[in-house]
């Protein structure tokens, strides 16, 4: 499907396949959340014209980025990731595991919007920069995981 992106979760050095699967799943979520937050941080820095000498704004943006990354990680657990396939490799009595997920971009966009709203509410930025940040979150993201 052209509206899906691929994201990979990996882990190694685990003995239980169930533990491997869970760690790989969590790693995929962490990777996606980190990439989404990096995208927002980059766009914010360039589009909002953040003045790095304004320590109050910088601190609030740091809180916002952390909250956004945390919330997007919890939001994408709700049906955004769909497992495509997994690969297990055994090395002695430990396993390496990799799961490839499809990220449904329609659902991911809704998750990012919800995460953005919650992160803005947690920071003081809602009144000052909400329109600019909302604009590029609503634009969607092409190839966020590349």
Task: Label each residue range with its predicted role.
Residues 1-146:
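Domain-level marker for long, solvent-exposed, non-transmembrane regions
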């Amino acid at each position: 499907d052209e509206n899906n992106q691929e994201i990979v979760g990996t882990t190694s050095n685990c003995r239980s396949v169930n533990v491997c699967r869970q760690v790989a799943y969590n790693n995929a979520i962490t990777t996606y959340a980190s990439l989404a937050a990096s995208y927002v941080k980059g766009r914010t820095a360039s589009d909002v014209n953040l003045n790095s000498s304004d320590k109050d704004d910088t601190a609030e943006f740091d809180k916002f980025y952390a909250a956004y990354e945390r919330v997007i990680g919890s939001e994408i657990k709700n049906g955004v990731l769909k497992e495509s396939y997994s690969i297990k490799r055994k090395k002695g009595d430990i396993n390496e595991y990799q799961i490839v997920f499809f990220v449904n971009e329609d659902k991911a966009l809704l998750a990012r919007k919800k995460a953005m709203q919650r992160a803005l509410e947690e920071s003081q930025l809602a009144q000052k920069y909400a329109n600019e940040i909302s604009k590029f979150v609503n634009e969607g993201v092409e190839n966020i995981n590349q």
